[in-house]
Amino acid sequence: MDKFYNYNSSSNQALLNLKVKPDSKQNLISDFVIINNLPYLKLFIKTAPEQGKANEEIINYLAKAWKLSRSNIEIIKGHTHSLKTILIKNIDEDYLNSIINSYIK
């Protein structure tokens, strides 16, 4: 699989799938896994999935790890599920590629 995300160059936005494991020992971005022929970035989050706290931690952690504003990361699908889709706004595709390539093993 050669594309791990969907990028819209006219709006500088990307969609990225996440496989989230809440209630983990540490916050950690792992690698990609294929689920139903789609790539998902594995993400371990310390926070338990209670009252949206894990979703908030996902946004905080990714924003810090990727040096993005929290307002540029939005969960658009899977709010109550471990499989999520995030929208990343105002991101250059070259920068996104550098982020993604660091997790491909």
Curated annotation (Swiss-Prot):
It holds the Pfam family DUF167. InterPro entries: DUF167, YggU-like_sf. GO terms for cellular component: cytoplasm. PANTHER family: UPF0235 PROTEIN C15ORF40. Belongs to the UPF0235 family. This is UPF0235 protein A1E_05380. It comes from Rickettsia canadensis (strain McKiel). The lineage of its organism: Bacteria, Pseudomonadati, Pseudomonadota, Alphaproteobacteria, Rickettsiales.
